[in-house]
């Protein structure tokens, strides 16, 4: 018994050391693993489309090429719209910098706060933070984004093509590599379940984010908020980050509405309420209904995962945090010695329900 406990202790120490080592490797080699992971997640999204195309007697490889080309065209169109908007931001920045000073002076006057443009804390903070330099650099970088990332996009597209090719032949490869029936069924079930759950999560998240961005764009366009395309895109992309992304989108859009429309409180309230309502209705009412149930992951661990992957891979890491956590949880639930980690990653009730679904992997089978 003591030897068994000792071996378990050694195993968990080695597991912890391996996690630390893997974290360091992922941080150092992020330029390689970020495109690879993005391609893997996008492959999960594209897989159902390619599979459905085969029903129309379209060969698998042709379906892959069609889906990738359509995605590339969509990226190109959206990218060009964003580049044009970023150039507009660069040209309009001096106007909004002056507008910020005006708005601040009006607010200071309304609340009887002493205002001196040369010594004001807010103005000095604005200047010391280098907001002007940041906006100019960001706009210039965004303008050249399509050219500087062309290589990365090509690499991701190639990864997607090969991932989708491999997925189709995965079942035969697993059967050949693991001829034992029980082990074969277990591995295939883990792979199938992982693909199904991650595909469902990313697909629903993409649709919700798309409609969120579209509605935010329309509301901003109707009220006349400048750079409506940028606010719509920010709402779309930030919605992939659970909770915090929607909050950040609302703060940025409403903050800019204050900058542009103050002292017209009606328009400011319109923007704030519209963006808040879109995020609340789509994120808290429609999305849970589409998903049917949550992913069974502890909210605290989602927060930890967002922080960890944000530190490792930046903004892209925060977008990928939840899908990666889903994959880890599914694997841990179906490998006996990793079951305790699966329990810690999820809610106890959800884990027990899932465990019943995987019960045919028990040894008696």
Model-derived segments and their meaning:
Residues 1-84, 160, 176, 325-326, ...:
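Anchoring transmembrane alpha helix of integral membrane proteins
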Residues 4-21, 87-108, 142-159, 213-223, ...:
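Hydrophobic alpha-helical transmembrane segments
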Residues 11, 147-256, 265-270:
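Alpha-helical transmembrane segments and their immediate interhelical loop/hinge regions
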Residues 30-38, 222-233, 262-270, 297-302, ...:
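Membrane-water interface of transmembrane alpha-helices in multipass transporters/channels
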Residues 42-43, 70-74, 160, 233-244, ...:
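Hydrophobic transmembrane alpha-helices
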Residues 49-56, 77-155, 165-167, 173, ...:
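Juxtamembrane membrane-interface segments in integral membrane proteins
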Residues 58-67, 118, 180, 184-188, ...:
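Membrane-interface starts of transmembrane alpha-helices
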Residues 268-365:
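Hydrophobic alpha-helical transmembrane segments of membrane transport and translocation systems
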């Amino acid at each position: 018994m003591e030897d068994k406990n000792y071996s378990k202790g050694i195993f968990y120490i080695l597991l912890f050391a391996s996690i630390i080592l893997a974290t360091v490797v992922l941080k150092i080699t992020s330029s390689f693993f970020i495109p690879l992971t993005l391609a893997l997640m996008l492959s999960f999204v594209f897989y159902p489309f390619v599979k459905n195309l085969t029903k129309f007697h379209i060969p698998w490889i042709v379906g892959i090429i069609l889906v990738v080309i359509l995605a590339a065209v969509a990226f190109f169109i959206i990218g060009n719209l964003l580049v044009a908007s970023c150039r507009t931001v660069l040209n309009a920045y001096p106007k909004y910098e002056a507008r910020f000073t005006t708005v601040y002076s009006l607010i200071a006057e309304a609340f009887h706060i002493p205002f001196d443009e040369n010594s004001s804390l807010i103005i000095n903070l604005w200047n010391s933070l280098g907001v002007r330099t940041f906006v100019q650099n960001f706009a210039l970088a965004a303008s050249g984004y399509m050219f500087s990332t062309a290589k990365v996009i090509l690499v991701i597209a190639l990864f997607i093509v090969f991932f989708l090719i491999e997925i189709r032949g995965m079942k035969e490869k697993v059967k050949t590599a693991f001829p034992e029936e029980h082990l074969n069924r277990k591995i295939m079930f883990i792979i199938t379940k992982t693909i199904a759950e991650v595909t469902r999560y990313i697909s629903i998240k993409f649709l919700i984010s798309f409609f969120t961005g579209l509605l935010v764009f329309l509301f901003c366009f109707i009220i006349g908020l400048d750079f409506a395309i940028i606010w719509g895109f920010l709402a779309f992309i930030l919605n992939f980050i659970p909770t915090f992304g929607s909050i950040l989108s609302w703060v940025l859009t409403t903050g800019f509405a204050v900058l542009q429309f103050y002292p017209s409180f009606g328009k400011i309230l319109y923007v704030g309420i519209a963006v808040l309502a879109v995020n609340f209705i789509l994120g808290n009412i429609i999305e849970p209904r589409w998903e049917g149930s949550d992913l069974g992951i502890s909210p605290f661990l989602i927060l930890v995962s967002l922080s960890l992957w944000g530190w490792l891979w930046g903004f892209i890491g925060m977008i990928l945090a939840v899908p990666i956590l889903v994959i880890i949880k599914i694997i841990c639930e179906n490998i006996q010695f990793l079951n305790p980690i699966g329990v810690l990653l999820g809610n106890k009730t959800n884990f027990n329900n899932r465990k019943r679904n995987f019960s045919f992997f028990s040894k008696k089978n």
